[in-house]
Amino acid sequence: MPQVKNLRVSGRIGPLIFYYVGDKFYARAAPGKIKQAPKTKTRSTNFGIASRAGKALRDGLADALPNTKDRQMQSRFSGAIAKWLGLQSVKTLTGPAEIPGLFLFMFGGHVAFEEKFRAPFTVSIKSEEAIEIHVPAFIPAKVMSGPDDTLSVECTFAVASCDLAIGRLLENKLVRWNIAYDNNIVPAQTFTLPCPHPPGSLMVVTGGLRFNALKRGIPVMSEDPSYISCSVIKTVVNVERAGG
């Protein structure tokens, strides 16, 4: 077998890599190139898109979320977006009226908003610039179940939209509605939240409840997860792209 002594070279020559460690010389085979299958590459790309979009939407909804630092919630939310994207291209998106995994997604609490707030509200898309939430007249003590000595309920509606291709937050809005917890009729309410969601965007609307009750004679917002609710009540994906 031929031998070469006093070789003073480092780097790659053909399929071999030459290098020194201390005063010793070594050679090893260069690693082969790994080529991703098209489906694997698409999934990897979409996972990155979902991660960026998830963060952008969470940032936009932050004031409505019970705990923005919940790592499990963050992972579940981005994972739900990634699962929906699957092998789709953001340039040719498709999506049902309500995206499975995202619609009714729980940001906090034990019960979805629609189960905790039993008034038959509706969420309508007015245009590419706004949404409208309508709540008919209701009696608070009959459509919500609060802890003992509940004084009032803080109801929040929030919306955020993002550009999926670049994961940029486009717009976000929040409305807080303080409702006395009693047997008096609350008149019908309509909330209009401006939120542009142009072609190529994903928009998420959430509903949330927190109960304000007496604790040792002092009004405090309940921290019991049984009386906290924040979940997705509407998803909208605008699939049409100019020139597409």
Describe the function of each predicted region:
Residues 3, 10-12, 221-244:
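Hydrophobic, glycine-enriched assembly/anchoring segments
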Residues 1-113, 243:
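Long, polar/Ser/Thr-enriched low-complexity segments
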Residues 85-230:
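Charged linear interaction tracts used for macromolecular binding and regulation
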